[in-house]
Amino acid sequence: ANNLTVPAIFEFEQPTAVLSANAEPAKAAAALIDKDSAVEMYAGFGKNVYTAFATIGGNAVGVVATGKELCHNCVAKASRFVRLCDAFSVPVLTIVNTEGFVPSTSDDIAGGIREAARLAATYADATTAKVALIAGKAVGPVYTALAAADLKIAVKGCTISALEPSAAVSVLYKDELDASANIAAA
């Protein structure tokens, strides 16, 4: 087998779960992939990211599903998995439901910024087919990194924002905040 070989199509059973906004990563993936087809990868590492090889309609895919805030371990796990899928031309389905990267100095010192940059570069450099499904919150730079896909789909009720709410307020209402004597009341 090589990269010119036609991919195998497997027998499959339709999923029985229903995708809902803000579902846990594994449950969100289970609603989209063929029943009992998932083989989870790196299960003990980066708990807020679910990575698995699975089938959708009998076709092999790599699934990355996010939840909550992403620490440096979660980001490294997703990046490593997408690079693996890209190396073997396995299409990647990314289910985005995250409030962003963990905003902590300790996470930054542990490599959070480096891993976030690596994740963005991995998605940008990947030549395999990439589909992003926004299934909850997609806020800030993590949206830009994870939704760098060939196709983006949003579930009804999801939230997409290029800026975190606090950053958006400070940008959009800067004049009002500067003019106010009581910033908390503004």
Name every feature range the model reports, one short phrase each.
Residues 1-186:
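Ligand-binding clefts of soluble mixed alpha/beta catalytic domains
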